[in-house]
């Protein structure tokens, strides 16, 4: 995680994330209070807004593009792979470092909400579940996207290519969320709804816990980390 804080990209991400989330927070707070809207909470509005998802889709590829691509470019991957470190340990360390920094990026949003909770108390209209569960879903989605970013970064030594391919793959998977609006019904609609990040976030932001997305995202994250480990194992054998 230390490597993130010596990179200017990290501070750009932190600044942009804080700025966009802060602006979104202020906008929705004013909008909901002025129009006296009670149908959804402040956190629901923020976490279902366009800029929330745009920021999430863009920041993860930028966050993970250096993970292995830079090691390939600098030639340090050979030294790492010949060290007494197993591939899964390397993948896990990169993954946990990225997840920790990802959490730091979104921490200001939690702080904004904490301040409002202190000032307004229960009049804010949000239970503990409505506050904790959306951030849990955000973390799960972030972990899944990060695992994709690490996998793509392990395939190339060009950081820009890693970022572009990661974004393309993440966006493709995210686009499945919009299939539900094509008028599909029956079991197909139910399956798409189960795979939809938008529906999952909406459910959790209402304070409703559903174990299915947790299992799905956890399994998908493990799958991409497993693929990354196999890529590194193949590179070790090739050396």
Question: Language-model segments: what does each one mean?
Answer:
Residues 6-30, 51-60, 168-174:
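Hydrophobic alpha-helical transmembrane segments of multi-pass membrane transport/permease proteins
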Residues 60-64, 112, 147-148, 227-228:
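Hydrophobic/aromatic residues in alpha-helical transmembrane segments
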């Amino acid at each position: 995680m230390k490597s993130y804080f010596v990179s200017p990209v990290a501070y750009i991400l932190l600044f942009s994330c804080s700025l966009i989330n802060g602006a979104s927070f202020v906008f929705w707070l004013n909008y909901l209070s002025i129009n006296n809207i009670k149908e959804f909470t402040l956190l629901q509005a923020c976490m279902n807004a366009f800029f929330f998802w745009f920021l999430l889709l863009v920041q993860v590829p930028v966050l993970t593009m250096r993970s292995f691509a830079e090691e390939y470019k600098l030639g340090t991957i050979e030294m790492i792979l010949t060290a007494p470190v197993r591939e899964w340990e390397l993948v896990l360390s990169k993954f946990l470092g990225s997840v920790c920094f990802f959490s730091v990026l979104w921490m200001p949003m939690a702080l904004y909400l904490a301040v409002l909770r202190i000032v307004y108390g229960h009049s804010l209209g949000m239970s503990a579940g409505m506050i904790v569960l959306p951030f849990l879903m955000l973390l799960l989605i972030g972990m899944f996207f990060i695992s994709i970013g690490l996998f793509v970064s392990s395939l190339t030594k060009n950081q820009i290519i890693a970022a572009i391919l990661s974004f393309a793959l993440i966006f493709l998977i995210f686009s499945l969320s919009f299939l539900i609006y094509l008028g599909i019904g029956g079991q197909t609609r139910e399956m798409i709804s189960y795979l939809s990040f938008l529906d999952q976030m909406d459910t959790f932001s209402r304070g409703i816990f559903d174990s299915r997305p947790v299992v799905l995202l956890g399994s998908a994250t493990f799958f991409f980390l497993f693929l990354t480990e196999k890529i590194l194992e193949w590179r070790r054998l090739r050396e």
